[in-house]
Amino acid sequence: MSTRWQIAARLSGGRCGCIYVHFDGYPEHALRTLQAAYTDQKISDQLIALGDCRSVGVRIEECDTFSGREGEKWEDIKPTYGDDLKAVADVHRHGDENYRYTWDGRQWAMEQL
């Protein structure tokens, strides 16, 4: 069974962005990975820019994205951007996510949905 999740982040320049991730959203994996590998602002920005993902790896290059997969349109999998972190995450929500992980520019937080 998939543990679906969101990543919502405050980006460089103050904007906020959000993506959906399909697998491995349980805190023992997702929060640990984000805290270990995505605490550099530039890397967090790059993660959001990938768009929706199947899974997130410990390096950007290891993220399995939906982009480029047959039948996937960028319009459907692109990040949602805006000025308010919670509002961006709420707009991007698919409805079946179990967790939301947020980056405020300093640290990661987890919310069970």
Question: What positions do the PLM features span?
Answer:
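Compact beta-rich and alpha/beta scaffold cores in large eukaryotic transport/transcription complexes
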Residues: 17-42
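Short, extreme N-terminal segment that most often corresponds to the first beta-strand
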Residues: 1-26
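Low-complexity intrinsically disordered segments
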Residues: 35-113
